[in-house]
Amino acid sequence: MTENSVVEVDEGVFESTAVIDNGSFGTRTIRFETGRLAQQAAGAVVAYLDDETMLLSATSASKHPKEHFDFFPLTVDVEERMYAAGRIPGSFFRREGRPSTDAILTCRLIDRPLRPSFVDGLRNEIQVVVTVMSLNPQDLYDVVAINAASASTQIAGLPFSGPVGGVRVALIVSEDNKAGQWVAFPTVDQLENAVFDMVVAGRVVSGSGDNADVAIMMVEAEATDNVIAKIADGAQAPTEAIVAEGLEAAKPFIARLCAAQAALASKAAKPTGDYPVFPAYQDDVFAAVEAAASEKLNAALTIAGKQERDDKTDEVKVEVLEQVAPNFEGREKELGAAFRSLTKKLVRQRILRDQFRIDGRGVTDIRSLSAEVAIIPRAHGSALFERGETQILGVTTLDMVKMAQQVDSLGPETTKRYMHHYNFPPYSTGETGRVGSPKRREIGHGALAERALMPVLPSVEEFPYAIRQVSEALSSNGSTSMGSVCASTLALLNAGVPLRAPVAGIAMGLVSDQVDGETRYVALTDILGAEDAFGDMDFKVAGTKDFVTALQLDTKLDGIPSQVLAGALSQAKDARTTILEVMAEAIDTPDEMSPFAPRVTAIKVPVDKIGEVIGPKGKMINSITEQTGANISIEDDGTVFVGATDGPSAQAAIDMINAIANPQLPKVGERFLGTVVKTTAFGAFVSLLPGRDGLVHISKLGSGKRIAKVEDVVNVGSKIRVEIADIDARGKISLIPVEEGNDEAAAPAADEAASE
């Protein structure tokens, strides 16, 4: 990597650059520019990835704080502009509308490391808007957006302890290097050869340059869709040790990005403004609450059951607030915040000193587990997974591949065959609230569960279905997203989906503090909701028994020692193995498909025969659909997906398609049960096979007697037994009727096709 530098390219326009060296994979250049665009924003930075990818980030702040808020009002928005890819939006109004899933997930990637970097108690509204203005189709913009948002916030004069650097690193393997190399800012083509892909964000806490100490703040990682094929070919599996190596590999890249942002800020940043902060409580309030509540609250926190513990804690809170409130009139909000802080302190102390948790478990214990399948009668697949008080219902629906989601975004993905939707109704925590369209959190949790399962899904050739998986969080007390992974694995197997391996997930936590003069770290397996809120880390790991398929980490600490992280990963694997064993007791192989699920078969026809299968204005394919009741979808490569509610209907449609695409000429003397498709003055045209008609002359219709009109004997739609009398040089077929009772030789294939 070359040294970072900042230059004034024009009057008041500054630019800094970070060059990322990927060795044999080349270099990537990230350039930050400020002073040219969006000059009325508090801070505005344009970030470039090489020459063609360009994002504008603008950070603004309200002039007055929202004193009545008890949270930090930070909003992050990502605006995908279709002109960035030279496209017109596909919506009815041909204008960008609601944000895409990619944009929402990028908002979350930005928010998670930025939010804890602001000073505690800030109540001014802060908005960061990132606009994607140009995008090379080989680039993924999300990590560029993290850096752009951090840079614009760093120069905005806000109480912000950045900069924050974000990088995507992928473990890319090749024929010459099966162990792989961690490559920063990989292209879409390079990701095709990767086994693992992770977005890592962090900041420099001490040092500089190659000696910088980088604290990891956020990780979003996944195994690639083709990881199992790569492993079978000899590639390195993304085990816990490999994932830990990837996190270390990301740190020098993050340091370089932070240095470039800091260099830009040294020339262009505004002085930090005078922003008032509103501490949750003053020291005198905490001291009074601690003196009044410690003993009773400690006792309440030993109750194992969540509902009973919460009820007792609320009871203690009411008693204590009534006791101390007269001394703090008008400061009731502080009392509530102090009580919460005391609860956090006591929970953490108990874990650190006694290795004991609020529900009575040890630090590595998993709550009671339960798994059951076939819960919903008419669903194609369903399962109920319970871990303690967390209860997830997974439901699988199968349909034709044409029902795959069409994606209109700037990402490389245009369709999604596997769709994972996560719902978190308010009753899951015993509360009331809004229901309806999903919130960002629900979209993020669904995406995490989706990424965990994608590597083990069968290919469309192996299983020609679109799959919708819904996770219903019926009860929540810790990691419903990882519960969704477990419930989804069970439901998919119940639906008959041939997964390459079952996947389970677990949420890990971490508590750290000074104990007897040294920093002590305790990793927690299967954290509760309270341990998530009061702990220092939320670390979700999903995978098979052999490797990690998805990982998500958020931490409040300025760095986690490598050995602590490795220990947490090892604990997570042990827990995952235990959960997989419980799941296997419920179901360990794919069930028979539900009778309510469609039967979908994929066949191939020559590309030059696609037009014949469709027919003029869709006449032929519509006729097959009407006769058999099957749904038919034809791809440009000649793949035909045939779906029906039962096997015979699907087979009848397949036979009719094959008769057109791969025809076998009938022979003289063959007999058929045909259908009259047209009558003329000289005879009746009879359909023998799809696309193959013959003529019964009027002179042959009267059983030796002369008839005036064809319609006196048959009409369109009539069934008639016929025999091929002649096939001329042009392939035209002449037919003669066959007397009923003398039709034993009638072609059985024709009988079957006609009877459908």
Curated annotation (Swiss-Prot):
Sequence ranges assigned to domain S1 motif in this UniProt record: 669-738
SMART domains reported for this sequence: KH, S1
Annotated KH domain residues: 598-657
GO molecular-function terms, A-Z: 3'-5'-RNA exonuclease activity; magnesium ion binding; polyribonucleotide nucleotidyltransferase activity; RNA binding
Location in or out of the cell: Cytoplasm
Record-listed E.C. numbers: 2.7.7.8
Gene3D superfamilies according to UniProt: GHMP Kinase, N-terminal domain, K Homology domain, type 1, Nucleic acid-binding proteins
GO cellular component annotations of the record: cytosol
Swiss-Prot/TrEMBL cofactor(s): Mg(2+)
Catalytic activity from the UniProt record: RNA(n+1) + phosphate = RNA(n) + a ribonucleoside 5'-diphosphate
Chief site of localization: cytoplasm
Keyword Cytoplasm included in the entry's annotation: yes
UniProt keyword Magnesium, yes or no: yes
Keyword field: Cytoplasm, Magnesium, Metal-binding, Nucleotidyltransferase, RNA-binding, Transferase
InterPro entries attached to this UniProt entry: ExoRNase_PH_dom1, ExoRNase_PH_dom2_sf, GPSI/PNP, KH_dom, KH_dom_type_1, KH_dom_type_1_sf, NA-bd_OB-fold, PNPase
List of residues binding Mg(2+): 532, 538
Protein family: Belongs to the polyribonucleotide nucleotidyltransferase family.
Role according to the record: Involved in mRNA degradation. Catalyzes the phosphorolysis of single-stranded polyribonucleotides processively in the 3'- to 5'-direction.
Name this polypeptide is given: Polyribonucleotide nucleotidyltransferase
Species lineage: Bacteria, Bacillati, Actinomycetota, Actinomycetes, Mycobacteriales
